[in-house]
Amino acid sequence: MGNLKVETEMKAVILLSGGLDSSTVLYQAKADGYECHPISFDYQQRHRRELHSAFLVAQTLGVVKHQVVNFDLRLWGGSALTDETINLPQERSLDEMSQNIPVTYVPARNTIFLSFALGYAEAIAAQRVYIGVNALDYSGYPDCRPDYIQAMQKVFQLGTKQGREGNPIKIVAPLIDLKKTEIIQLGNQLGVPWELTWSCYAGSDVACGVCDSCRLRLAAFAELGLKDPLPYRERE
């Protein structure tokens, strides 16, 4: 009996883009006591530079394995992130960002991502899928809202063997009710290395400072009286 090893560690799959939110969520999952299995997506996005940050952030925690799934959403485009003929919004105010669903919305992206994460989680017998969606500072994205996450949880329950047997994989969205400033404060508590993260949509090796994602990030650091350690090509 003394030599009997009981496997008790809980596993979690974490959607990791390399950005501020998803990096915080990875660190939160680790703090919650899970064996972390990050999954990232190379969908030929304009800002593929984020994948390098995802790799670096995952390395800081010494994760078991970092999966990168490859597919090409340029096949049908529909977003400034997958179709370079669509211009990225620049220099917009926070009020302007909140008016409409922006051209940086990628059609059904989180549904695609969560489907891959669900399959991966069930294959490795993980109990949780962590995602860094945020409903308060979202740029109009419909798949970052509480009702969407609730609907996807139902899919997790009904669409898997694990769910039908009464032990559904649960979606954890710890940032969904937090403002961007609160996410940064949480990340500071968790020790997230902001200098390794990436938020810019522009697709270059230096953050532009003027796209919506950069502006949201810079505004949050500024509101807290903090300097964003990420270098920018252009600062206000």
Language model: regions and residue ranges:
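ATP-dependent adenylation/nucleotidyltransferase module used to activate substrates
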Residues: 4-190
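Short, intrinsically disordered, charge-biased short linear motifs at domain edges
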Residues: 187-189, 194-203
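Local cysteine-cluster metal-coordination motifs and their immediate loop/turn environment
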Residues: 198-219
